[in-house]
Amino acid sequence: MRNIKYTITRSLLGIGMLLSIVSCEIQDSFTYDYAPDNTKLNMSAWAFIQGNDSLSFFREAIQVAQLESMYEATEGATYIVPNNQAFRSYFKDNGYSTIANIPVPILKNMLRYHIVKSIVNFNDPALAPSNKPIAYDTENGQTMYLSHTSTYVGLINEGTNRQWQIRTSNLVPDNGVIHVLNAVVYYSAPTGDVNVNP
């Protein structure tokens, strides 16, 4: 009886070892294969905004303000794009019910602040150090600070009185870079700065 148990145990161990050796496979490459991390959209920023249902309030705001040409421009820019959730919060916080209720001068100023005059892609080596905001000029003449955390989550106006997190970053249309976020952003003075506007 002992011999039978011993034989069965040895047989099972042998079969187990044989199966474990057969199930091993050779890895083709021991180096990490990098994939491109930017999504090339092959369209203008305006075409992307028009084709995305979650940006319908932003699209309507651009049309009411008649700023479509700024989103079709051929020179590069960075487009900070608030999604529908952002506009719902903006409506609630500011007492508006629709885009049409926002006075056009306020709407134009807000939209121009959401266009940075430089291409800011968070894969840029100049932005490699985390938590180091860089000042950029916007189309309305104010300054926007862009940076990222150590986990490469994009931040707007870090180090100021109010900062925001970017939800989706580094979308690359033909005319710049798009960063989508859940908030309508505004100029925020650097912490300790008593000036209302630069």
Predicted segment positions?
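Bacterial N-terminal signal peptides that target proteins for export
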Residues: 1-13
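Bacterial Sec-dependent N-terminal signal peptides
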Residues: 2, 20-48, 192
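Bacterial N-terminal signal peptides
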Residues: 11-21
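Second-shell loop/turn segments in exported
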Residues: 42-49, 69, 94-100, 167-168
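Beta-edge loop/turn motif
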Residues: 54-130, 176-183
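Aromatic/histidine-rich interaction motifs
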Residues: 100-165, 187, 197-198
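Short, exposed beta-strand-loop hairpins at the edges of beta-sheets
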Residues: 167-175
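Edge beta-strand at a domain terminus
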Residues: 175-180, 185-198
